[in-house]
């Protein structure tokens, strides 16, 4: 776990800030993304940068659309999705108006300083020549491989890359995507803060399934799309505790089912789903407390672990997001599943308070009454107390 923490804090990693889409007043920028093949990737980048994603158009939200969408350009209310990619690539918040889609703009390249004359149709991709890869595209490729490659042979075959090309993840051909990954990206996941090599399913269940169905293992379909049928939304709410908090022990037991560990940007603690680890005990403390913990801590049943897995999968399926994004949302909402569901759906917590960010957690550690009072004013006394308990678990 210490190794994962070091990777998450790699100063040389070309990743964007966790407050990239946070305003100066501390509030998160809200985005609405029109349905498209790139919506999932954009949502992941936005949430990682501290922003929120709305399921419907809301007042004050930045409306995003792909260049070339006639309705979006005709309205003049939409910003090009290239805005998100450029902000991530430069790791800075750029001018929104320079990316506004409209009849007078060149939709294919809405960057600052671009010519506004000519057709509104997107510029066709050139048939010859090379298009340079951006850091955002490299992250997108690694993320796609991590989520969709089911075996080491998947990345050397062609099906995965053809599926990636059809998803319009980038403007590159599947041959170029495959070449980029095999020659430049494979084994470099740690530099992009994506953890270890993606193609290593830890679940024996997934391994057996891949052996039984080799074609499915190379199909390029997202893993979360192959999950068993899930109950309706009403059942999801039934799985949530009355106080809205996740059972951390359940999620710790459930984590291996997904084969992923998620490292948060917040200081001093790491999570597996919503499991937080505090400071490691000294050998003396460990030897003294371990027997008591084994006696007092109730064993989690298989049924309870299954319920936790089901709830997380339902959030992933419901909002079409990956495990990392759902986990980050849970962390920013102190492990409250009901609040997390509301946050992913509307970009807001049901109690109206903001989500927690790295700076808030740093302030929470300060022994300063003024700082603590400011946090209580910002989040409410109950949420501050809940956050403190959440970090201790």
UniProtKB/Swiss-Prot annotation:
Q: Where is the BRCT domain?
A: 78-101
Give this protein's Gene Ontology molecular function annotations: G-rich strand telomeric DNA binding; phosphatase binding; telomeric DNA binding
Which parts of the sequence carry Phosphoserine?
A: 36, 43, 151, 153, 200, 203
Spell out the disulfide connections. none
InterPro entries in the record = BRCT_dom, BRCT_dom_sf, Homeodomain-like_sf, Rap1_C, TE2IP/Rap1, TERF2IP_Myb
Q: Is Cytoplasm given among the entry's keywords? A: yes
Per its record, how is this protein called by name? Telomeric repeat-binding factor 2-interacting protein 1
Query: Which species?
Result: Mus musculus
Query: What is the gene called?
Result: Terf2ip
């Amino acid at each position: 776990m210490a190794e994962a923490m070091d990777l998450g804090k790699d100063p040389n990693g070309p990743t964007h800030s966790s407050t990239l889409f946070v305003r100066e007043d501390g509030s998160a920028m809200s985005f609405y993304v029109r349905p498209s093949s790139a919506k999932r990737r954009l949502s992941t980048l936005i949430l990682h940068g501290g922003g929120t994603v709305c399921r419907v158009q809301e007042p004050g939200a930045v409306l995003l659309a792909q260049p070339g969408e006639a309705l979006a350009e005709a309205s003049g209310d939409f910003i090009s999705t290239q805005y998100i990619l450029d902000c991530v690539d430069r790791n800075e918040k750029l001018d929104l108006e320079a990316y506004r889609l409209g009849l007078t703009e060149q939709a294919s390249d809405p960057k600052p300083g671009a010519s506004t004359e000519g057709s509104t149709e997107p510029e066709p991709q050139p048939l010859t020549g090379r298009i340079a890869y951006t850091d955002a595209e490299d992250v997108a490729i690694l993320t796609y491989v991590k989520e969709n490659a089911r075996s080491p042979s998947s990345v050397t075959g062609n099906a995965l890359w053809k599926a990636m090309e059809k998803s319009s993840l980038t403007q590159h051909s599947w041959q170029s995507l495959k070449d980029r990954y095999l020659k430049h990206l494979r084994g470099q996941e740690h530099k992009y803060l994506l953890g270890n090599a993606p193609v290593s399913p830890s679940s024996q269940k997934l391994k057996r399934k891949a052996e039984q169905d080799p074609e499915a293992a190379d199909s390029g379909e997202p893993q979360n799309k192959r999950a068993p049928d899930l109950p309706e939304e009403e059942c999801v709410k039934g799985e949530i505790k009355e106080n809205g908090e996740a059972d951390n022990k359940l999620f710790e037991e459930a984590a291996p089912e997904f084969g992923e560990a998620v490292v948060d940007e917040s200081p001093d603690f790491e999570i597996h789903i919503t499991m937080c680890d505090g400071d490691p005990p000294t050998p003396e403390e460990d030897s003294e407390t371990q027997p008591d913990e084994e006696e007092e801590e109730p064993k989690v049943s298989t049924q309870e672990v299954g319920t936790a897995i089901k709830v997380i999968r339902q959030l992933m399926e419901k909002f079409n997001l990956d495990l990392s994004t759902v986990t980050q949302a849970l962390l920013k909402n102190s492990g409250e599943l009901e609040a997390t569901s509301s946050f992913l759906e509307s970009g807001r917590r049901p109690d109206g308070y903001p989500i927690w960010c790295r700076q808030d957690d740093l302030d929470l550690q300060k022994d300063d009454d003024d700082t603590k009072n400011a946090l209580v004013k910002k989040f409410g006394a109950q949420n501050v107390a809940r956050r403190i308990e959440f970090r201790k678990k």
